[in-house]
UniProtKB/Swiss-Prot annotation:
Signal peptide: 1-20
Reported cofactor(s): Zn(2+)
Glycosylation sites: N239
Protein name per its UniProtKB record: Zinc metalloproteinase/disintegrin PMMP-2
GO molecular function: metal ion binding; metalloendopeptidase activity; toxin activity
EC numbers on record: 3.4.24.-
Biological source species: Protobothrops mucrosquamatus (Taiwan habu)
Binding residue positions for Zn(2+): H333, H337, H343
Residues in Disintegrin domain copies: 403-484
Assembly information from the UniProt record: Monomer.
Primary location: secreted
Catalytic residues, chain numbering: E334
Length: 484
């Protein structure tokens, strides 16, 4: 595989002396100040893209040197990504901005197998990384003529309200006996290697949130992009790519009645999505970001197992924290409900309680970044029972020939498979080529690295359409029964 470009940033670390400081993410009472210095590995005179496909940062945390590897999140935007706002006279204004050369990255810490990172490099470095089991945040200090950044732990952010923040979901979709029985099965590690799924996401911002950010559409847009980048990172272990399809800002007034009763707001938003938003642009799921204070301690709500249903593939999320990472965890949680996941509680004689997992009923401190085994079981059960069709197909994207980057969710020039993790049994992470003896790495007609037999049903009949069956020569599931 062609050697990717590496950029090294040297960070000098200075301990802060004094009390707290007010950052964009809130008041922080303990942090380190770092000054990035960029050193490029490109030959002198070479043309640099604004944002490289791959970067490497070296810095110290608590006196220990770390190496942060970053790769651009090329699956962040759909090819038809749009942004919509409204003029003072109520006219809908939609644009299709160029987002190919964006500045949002995912990554990991060298020699830390459990590490993750989600970083924006748009204006300095902003985001989070997980190091040795602890979550750190980084953001620019916004000092005049300075490259200073702050690195700090989530627990060092001063909390205005210590009361637990709750998800408003209470229903259980596992109703009939066959589903109950299936829900008690535990997945093997092999079964937890989920096939790739894709969710084209629409984000709608209500008028209260527009006012909250001083009517600054650009600030809201950046916040939404950072949020989806974080959500995308948290869904990687489930092999789900969250792609932002559209962003709509209700910049004049709300198009539904947003009210403190979260259940009513959710129902109204679902009906609006079904009758209005789906007619504007294709997408799989819509999330309403609002600044309203819901009744009780509710900060989010979504229909369980609603994915791909016109009025139920929705969620409502309160933008209650200045820290975008926290709100991203809430959105990840509500999307989990749409994908069939219930709260991590003791249920059906299963021990599912996990206070530090994404699907816990209350947001943890620090916010969770991992799904429990029970959540993975719920998701697999949802796929089996509902067979949601809308998340099978990869979103349209611009086909560019670029340096192959493993694990970016898409096949690129020179890749036979998107390898991602070195533990992938079918795909060599070093070369992005199939391992010896492997015919495939993923797909509806791929099973344990081999093509499924000819005429194996890979997609059940829908309406007048017949069953789709494997050809025996490809990992893809052909449409309309064309199996040869």
């Amino acid at each position: 595989m062609i050697q990717v470009l590496l950029v090294t940033i040297c960070l000098a670390v200075f301990p802060y002396q004094g009390s707290s400081i007010i950052l964009e993410s809130g008041n922080v009472d303990d942090y380190e100040v770092v000054y990035p210095r960029r050193v490029s590995a490109l030959p002198k005179g070479a043309v640099q893209p604004k944002y490289e496909d791959a970067m490497q940062y070296e810095f110290k945390v608590n006196g220990e040197a770390v190496v942060l590897h970053l790769e651009k999140n090329k699956g962040l935007f759909s090819e038809d990504y749009s942004e919509t706002h409204y003029s003072p006279d109520g006219r809908e204004i939609t644009t299709y901005p160029s987002v190919e050369d964006h500045c949002y990255y995912h990554g990991r810490i060298h020699n830390d197998a459990d590490s993750t990172a989600s970083i924006s490099a748009c204006d300095g470095l902003k985001g989070y990384f997980k190091l040795q089991g602890e979550t750190y945040l980084i953001e620019p200090l916004k000092l005049p003529d300075s490259e200073a950044h702050a690195v700090y732990k989530y627990e060092n952010i001063e909390k205005e309200d210590e009361a637990p923040k709750m998800c408003g979901v209470t229903q259980n979709w596992e109703s009939d006996e066959s589903i109950k029985k299936a829900s008690q099965l535990n997945l093997t590690p092999l079964q937890q290697r989920f096939l790739q799924r894709y969710v084209k996401l629409a984000i709608v911002v209500d008028y209260r949130m527009y006012i909250k950010y001083n009517r600054d559409s650009n600030k809201i847009t950046v916040r939404a992009h950072e949020m989806v980048n974080h959500v995308n990172e948290m869904y990687k272990p489930l092999n789900i790519t969250i792609t932002l399809s559209l962003l709509q800002i209700w910049s004049q007034n709300d198009l539904i009645t947003v009210q403190p009763a979260s259940s009513i707001t959710l129902r109204l938003f679902g009906n609006w999505r079904k009758t209005v938003l789906l007619n504007q642009q294709n997408h799989d799921n819509a999330q309403l970001l609002t600044d309203i204070v819901f009744n009780g301690r509710t900060i989010g709500k979504a229909p369980v197992a609603g994915m791909c249903q016109p009025d139920r593939s929705v969620g409502v999320v309160r933008d209650y924290s200045s820290n975008v990472f926290v709100v991203a965890v809430i959105m990840t949680h509500e999307l989990g409900h749409n994908l069939g996941m219930e709260h991590d509680e003791d249920k059906n004689e299963k021990k599912c309680k996990c206070d530090t997992c994404i699907m816990a009923p209350a947001i943890s401190d620090p916010p969770a970044q991992l799904f429990s085994d029970c959540s993975k079981n719920d998701y697999q059960l949802f796929l089996t029972v509902y067979n949601p069709q809308c998340i099978l197909n990869a979103p349209l994207r611009t086909d560019t020939v670029s340096t192959p980057v493993s694990g970016n969710e898409f096949l690129e020039a020179g890749e036979e498979c998107d390898c991602g993790s070195p533990e992938n049994p079918c795909c060599d992470a070093a070369t992005c080529k199939l391992r010896p003896g492997a015919q495939c790495a993923e797909g509806l007609c791929c099973d344990q690295c081999r093509f499924k037999k000819k005429r194996t049903i890979c997609r059940r009949a829908r309406g007048d359409n017949p069953d789709d069956r494997c050809t025996g020569q490809s990992a893809d599931c052909p449409r309309n029964g064309l199996y040869g």
